[in-house]
Amino acid sequence: MTRTVLVLNSGSSSLKFQLLEPDSGASLADGIVERIGEDSSSASLVCGEREVTHSERVPDHEAALRTAYGLFDEAGAELGSVGLVAVGHRVVHGGPDLYQPTLIDDALVDTLESLAPLAPLHNPPAVLGIRGARKAFPDLPHVAVFDTAYFHDLPVAAATYAIDRDLSEQWHIRRYGFHGTSHQYVSEQAALFLDVPLSSLSQIVLHLGNGASASAILGGRPIDTSMGLTPMEGLVMGTRSGDVDPGVLVYLWRTAGMSVDEIETMLNKRSGVRGLGGEIDFRVLHQRIESGDESDRENAQLAYDVYIHRLRKYIGAYLALLGSTDVIVFTAGVGENDAAVRRDALSGMGRLGIELDEHLNESPSHTARRISAETSPTTVLVIPTNEELAIARACVEVI
């Protein structure tokens, strides 16, 4: 029987799940439970030609898992009869010691719980998903795959913050980096697409989704990345601020009377594109820029301009770090689907060897494609990410 792996990605109010054949790369089923804990919860699963949906309240992540399993049964893909060999779990933060794909036991779950302060939006729901899945599949191996793994061996100068060294060492403060599974996957896919050795390429990878990060990759090894100790640093994101002067936080604490928890919530949930423009969906943002009332238009335009400004700064910095860049890769929801973001991120960079083909950039596609001009010294690609497949393949290597 063909081997399959169930991959779970637990968010604060959602559970994404996918059933894959790691050997062939085929996705057998793909689903999501959204708005967990709210009255308007919804769940859907696409399995082959069949789509199953539910709209019933899902109070917690354990209930979300039961809902997911029910969707599989309803779609005729009972998990007990599809050759399931492992359950893979995306875990955002593994701290200083956890970075290789790791078999999950009770001690590991306790460790992941202790790391919640490093990824308060991501690690707690991941632990809930792990606990629920281990109850549902007690006889299967469960594997944690860490977002931070790919960046574990960053150059010391890139990983080190210029703060008191004793404090850094005592509290394991360093640049960990995130979206590593995605950055590694698409950089490898870029080499395959171009039919050249990965070791020969210098790349800038731009993972632009609700969370967003950039990386500079030389010869298949990352030499810098935009996210840091936590997933808050770097690019402007859907609800996260990205880079911000630490003095702003001290000022808000001292002068505005905000607590540490309030500041953290503001940075994580009420900043970024939402904080400036009141919206995280770039499709809506573009609509407001084009046809909103004056206030909506100004706010949306400011959010977009700040987003692009920060993105261009990182591209420029990574061009300088790499010296020259063979490939720039856009991936994730915004990176794969928003032609305007890609255009504006790279506009005016012809002297740096980066030229887009306007027609190719505007042409939608769900497969890897080149969008740079034939005359462009730097190749620009759009490559769909597939973190779930990468996680599934990591699982079978461990078990």
Curated annotation (Swiss-Prot):
Subcellular location per the Swiss-Prot or TrEMBL entry: Cytoplasm
UniProt site positions, description: Transition state stabilizer: 179, 240
GO BP terms, alphabetized: acetate metabolic process; acetyl-CoA biosynthetic process
Cofactor note: Mg(2+). Can also accept Mn(2+).
Catalyzed reactions per annotation: acetate + ATP = acetyl phosphate + ADP
Keyword tags: ATP-binding, Cytoplasm, Kinase, Magnesium, Metal-binding, Nucleotide-binding, Transferase
Cysteine pairs bridged by disulfides in the record: none
EC number: 2.7.2.1
GO MF: acetate kinase activity; ATP binding; magnesium ion binding
NCBIfam families listed in its UniProt record: ackA
UniProt function note: Catalyzes the formation of acetyl phosphate from acetate and ATP. Can also catalyze the reverse reaction.
Name used for this protein in its record: Acetate kinase
